Amino acid sequence: MANYFNTLNLRQKLDQLGRCRFMDRNEFADGCNFLKGKKIVIVGCGAQGLNQGLNMRDSGLDISYALRAEAIAEKRASFTRATENGFKVGTYQELIPTADLVINLTPDKQHSKVVADVVPLMKQGSAFGYSHGFNIVEEGEQIRKDITVVMTAPKCPGTEVREEYKRGFGVPTLIAVHPENDPKGEGMAIAKAWASATGGDRAGVLESSFVAEVKSDLMGEQTILCGMLQAGSIVCYDKLVADGKDPAYASKLIQYGWETITEALKQGGITLMMDRLSNAAKIRAFELSEEIKVQLNDLYLKHMDDIISGEFSSTMMADWANGDVNLFKWREETGKTAFENSPKADGIKISEQEYFDNGVVMVAMVKAGVEMAFDAMVASGIYEESAYYESLHELPLIANTIARKRLYEMNVVISDTAEYGNYLFSHVATPILAEKLIPMLQKGDLGEPTPAAEIDNVYLRDINDAIRNHPVELIGQELRGYMTDMKRISSQG
């Protein structure tokens, strides 16, 4: 199969990359009625599969799970999750032929096999759904022309999709219809109803495209969302220990620091995050962020270029074909880092403000990383709304996974695709930061507060203006207006 994006001409590529419209709430007045009375079968019962299914069932839809015969016979985790939650479970042959909508929520690397096994069993005129378009865009999967192909992609891990729904809210969601597969013109109605059933319409829905979702999603997860947090965790921990800090304190400052810092980011963007610092620390964080951009911007652009060209996906799929040799090797190497093996911080107390005061360079990494990822996406034709959701918006959710069980938890929760891209980025970014940024750090940049200093009002004013007028802040202020009931996320120890 050929990479679908690479088969498009330039005009088509730009059109697909630029598909992005924030949908009005009244467009969801019918809720999920379009899917009521229809048989919906979910393939896969992992985090997204289970939690989307729970939400859809609670919204009044008919949900069942199709699993491989061996998964049922051996009572594997997917079978146990589905049955313990009271869902009907059957084999592909038992459930797929009567389904009106089949939703594929298996890992990316399984999609081609799932399509080969499932689509021939689907009835004429039915629909097939994804929550990530990698199989369509990067692998070039071609689905039977009588089948409608749609995507509903919540911009959160599956656990948060469920928790926000239970609160009566939801998570921001991208929806799309594959232009090659909408024979009856019902694709958008299906995607809207699916998004409503998961609660997405309560938090905001972007009408997007398979292409825009995939290219922006890959860029965000490889760079700021996972790669930058991994590289930053490793170099900051090593620096603290080298400076004589208690390893347990250093571990806690890093492990819970990302989460605490990005909670402010979630509520008020980079502006609020920077406002949590003293004036002297804010100036220093701004200066460090500009230096980080000098050091890493070329790497961000390379990742964006490799994603657009298909180089990243072809490299990763070659590793799939080789039994994930590189993925497993890199996962093992991550488990051996000093940060991952640092002592637990039992009894050590760090106040919320101390995470900011003693983590100025971490704040700088977040600021620089978000802005570089956002700018690279927009420069490649991705609209600002999509770039915001795939950079700033998801960052607190990923930081929360590190707070739970460090980098191990982050890499378990994210997809294998995200994990592979994370390693590609962090393996290059970590030595750059260690060799260029860390030697530049001064007293007060990490592990202790920034010393008081005389402040130049004009310089501070200009820095504040630069922070508040970056495009990610301008679009972020607008989009956060649709998410007026965001809960605080905290695993703080």
Curated annotation (Swiss-Prot):
Its cofactor is Mg(2+). Keywords: Amino-acid biosynthesis, Branched-chain amino acid biosynthesis, Magnesium, Metal-binding, NADP, Oxidoreductase, Repeat. It is an enzyme of class 1 (oxidoreductase). Its EC number is 1.1.1.86. Residues 14-208 form the KARI N-terminal Rossmann domain. One of its GO terms (biological process) is isoleucine biosynthetic process. Residues 209-345, 346-486 form the KARI C-terminal knotted domain. Mg(2+) 2 binds at D217, E390, E394. GO terms for cellular component: cytosol. Pfam families: KARI_C, KARI_N. The active site is at H132. Involved in the biosynthesis of branched-chain amino acids (BCAA). Catalyzes an alkyl-migration followed by a ketol-acid reduction of (S)-2-acetolactate (S2AL) to yield (R)-2,3-dihydroxy-isovalerate. In the isomerase reaction, S2AL is rearranged via a Mg-dependent methyl migration to produce 3-hydroxy-3-methyl-2-ketobutyrate (HMKB). In the reductase reaction, this 2-ketoacid undergoes a metal-dependent reduction by NADPH to yield (R)-2,3-dihydroxy-isovalerate. This is Ketol-acid reductoisomerase (NADP(+)). The gene is ilvC.
